Amino acid sequence: MGRPYVTLNLNGMFMDKFKPYSKSNAPITTLEKLSKALSISVEELKAIAELPLDEKYTLKEIPKIDGSKRIVYSLHPKMRLLQSRINKRIFKELVVFPSFLFGSVPSKNDVLNSNVKRDYVSCAKAHCGAKTVLKVDISNFFDNIHRDLVRSVFEEILHIKDEALEYLVDICTKDDFVVQGALTSSYIATLCLFAVEGDVVRRAQRKGLVYTRLVDDITVSSKISNYDFSQMQSHIERMLSEHDLPINKRKTKIFHCSSEPIKVHGLRVDYDSPRLPSDEVKRIRASIHNLKLLAAKNNTKTSVAYRKEFNRCMGRVNKLGRVAHEKYESFKKQLQAIKPMPSKRDVAVIDAAIKSLELSYSKGNQNKHWYKRKYDLTRYKMIILTRSESFKEKLECFKSRLASLKPL
């Protein structure tokens, strides 16, 4: 017989497929090695670490549906660059994720090599055909992930040690906890239960249950009606308690197909594949109808408000595409007929963006990461000008100016 709980990594070593692991066994121990891995100089790494805390993170308050406020932070540009590199060069490149984790999981780094998009739709699909579902919500997840958990992620999964380890732990936390709004936080949150979560999943599978976690949402399902989840819920609560992670009792519930259609991450799972609830499709249709009425009014399609409403509506239609809904192509075609149109305001915004690039280029910044982002964003802003012949001359002028400002 084979070994059902292990798989071979790239180095030919047997790895537990219920735990995340690194493709590389080479330890990163010094700032010099970290600098090489991230392509950021040691001097720059030190300069970023020495930024005042209130410059690294700027507090923002976002209203929640229940009337309370969510505290998030925006990053200093240099912190954003550093954390982006950590994500790209370490989490995305090196970590192989077990199949029960969804959200911040690159599809290419799947332990099953399935190359499936690991988003909320794929997560819901794992539970299709369920007749009883347990949902456990972790309360204020990021705010309760202590630096000790962050350290264990970098040290035990990624073999990062010594001064490189302490540096990364400091960069990825604020006041000893993970930061809501930091680029690295969702990866850390996805990985931080690695030491014990695999054992809970094994227990679930032995009982014929399906276990998934999408960041802070744990879902366990059974194809048996009125399944008793008390033992499994106890295992999950113990796992979270051991990591000092509180459960949101209000959002932790058991759902039965006999009483209502079962939904996971907003999608119905009482079919062979995930479906949007019928009332959601009706709301999308109504939204398109209202947008058409708005588009018929003079100059509306050039307004900021219309553009915002169009993008929101397109996002909802794209959800239909993700679940292969029969109305997707029809709704998309209707929206494409009423796209937002350019205005003189767009010309002014693009002109200002190119002037800013010209100034940055003259100062020799064309090899900087932030310069490339500004350049790409400016090109993106120009797309809307292609929708009107009236702006053809301006568009060609902008293209000509940008051609001499390419990043290195």
Swiss-Prot record:
Signal peptide: none annotated. Pfam families: RVT_1. This is Retron Ec48 reverse transcriptase. GO terms for molecular function: metal ion binding; RNA binding; RNA-directed DNA polymerase activity. Reverse transcriptase (RT) component of antiviral defense system retron Ec48, composed of a non-coding RNA (ncRNA), this reverse transcriptase (RT) and the following membrane protein. Expression of this retron confers protection against bacteriophages lambda, T2, T4, T5 and T7. At multiplicity of infection (MOI) of 0.02 cultures grow normally when infected with lambda without collapsing, at MOI 2 cultures enter growth stasis. At MOI 3 cell membranes are permeabilized within 15 minutes of infection but do not lyse, suggesting the phage are not able to finish a replication cycle. The keyword Metal-binding applies. It catalyses: DNA(n) + a 2'-deoxyribonucleoside 5'-triphosphate = DNA(n+1) + diphosphate. Keywords: Antiviral defense, Magnesium, Metal-binding, Nucleotidyltransferase, RNA-binding, RNA-directed DNA polymerase, Transferase. SUPFAM superfamilies: DNA/RNA polymerases. Mg(2+) binds at residues 137, 216-217. Residues 43-269 form the Reverse transcriptase domain. Belongs to the bacterial reverse transcriptase family. One of its GO terms (biological process) is defense response to virus. Its EC number is 2.7.7.49. It comes from the Bacteria. PANTHER family: NUCLEAR INTRON MATURASE 1, MITOCHONDRIAL-RELATED. The gene is ret.
